[in-house]
Amino acid sequence: MPNIKEIVSRINSVHSTQQITKAMKMVAAAKLTKAQHQLLQLRPYAGGLSDILNHVIYSTEAELTKHYTQKRTIQRLMLVVISSDKGLCGSFNANIIKNTEAYINQFKDLLPTQIDILVIGKKALNFFQKKDYNLITTYTDLAGQLQFEDISEVASFIMDAFLNYTYDRVELIYNLFGSAASQFVQLEPFLPIVHPASPSHNNHVDYIYEPSKASLVETLIPMTLKIQLYKALLESAASEHGARMTTMSKATDNAEELLKSLRITYNKTRQAAITNEILEIAAGAEALSQ
């Protein structure tokens, strides 16, 4: 059985750790509130913009949109993998990495050199570097600020690579935010744009195009893709903060349970020590009386 000094030291250590996890939980909760607010504002805008784009693509001559919508035989594939820069967020990054590797393994006909990864986030970067995957470029510290201008540059790089036929397909892999306790890995087509089905008559809208349909398409498609990538990063950021808050909450609760157990052990050890001292005093007194 450990002595009282060791138990007290362990109690102090666990208590200090609990204070840290509790503080991290509160910080993550504050960041989650902010990220969730941004995400809830963007989702309707992104959805509305996507609906407009689908209508325009469906009603526009294929020649105007073919560079973005035309399916190609896959000779080169780009995966945009979005992870976090920091850890202590449960299985958040592990799920992204696991699903990315599973998706890559589906392309049996492609050589490893035909699949490139664009990594956003240090955690995925560290993993894929060790595994010798082809990393075309990496971005870190984006999630901390999440400025649309920075995301726009990343999206432009991806679009240029696709339009120049460097890649035949681009996919996004990120965590979709459900709630603080639930995140889901999302595999989302980015390019080519999936050609929409015929819009329903209930949602039919006749648009007036100014100055022309061609100029609108030229502006609308890149903007929609930039918003799509920006939304994916917001989803990932909210998921990260939610996962970290949940993880730190569990760690704080576990520390409390461990403290209870250590305090019981401390009391038992102290009681045993006191009992032994009383027995020794009684034995000494009896010896003296004889």
From Swiss-Prot:
- Alphabetical list of InterPro entries matching this protein: ATP_synth_F1_ATPase_gsu, ATP_synth_F1_gsu, ATP_synth_F1_gsu_CS
Principal place where this protein is found?
A: membrane
Question: Signal peptide location in the record?
Answer: none
Q: Which GO terms describe its biological process?
A: proton motive force-driven plasma membrane ATP synthesis
Q: How does it sit in the membrane?
A: Peripheral membrane protein
The record's keywords, sorted A to Z, are:
ATP synthesis, Cell inner membrane, Cell membrane, CF(1), Hydrogen ion transport, Ion transport, Membrane, Transport
For this protein, the record's Pfam families field holds: ATP-synt
Q: Does the keyword Cell membrane apply?
A: yes
Q: Which PROSITE patterns match?
A: ATPASE_GAMMA (PS00153)
- Localisation per UniProt entry: Cell inner membrane
Q: Which GO terms describe its molecular function?
A: ATP binding; proton-transporting ATP synthase activity, rotational mechanism
A cellular component term, taken from the record's GO annotations: plasma membrane
Magnesium recorded as keyword: no
Q: What family is reported? A: Belongs to the ATPase gamma chain family.
The function of this protein is: Produces ATP from ADP in the presence of a proton gradient across the membrane. The gamma chain is believed to be important in regulating ATPase activity and the flow of protons through the CF(0) complex.
Q: How does it assemble?
A: F-type ATPases have 2 components, CF(1) - the catalytic core - and CF(0) - the membrane proton channel. CF(1) has five subunits: alpha(3), beta(3), gamma(1), delta(1), epsilon(1). CF(0) has three main subunits: a, b and c.
Protein name from the UniProt record = ATP synthase gamma chain
Query: What is the scientific name of the source organism?
Result: Amoebophilus asiaticus (strain 5a2)
User: Which gene name does the record give?
Assistant: atpG
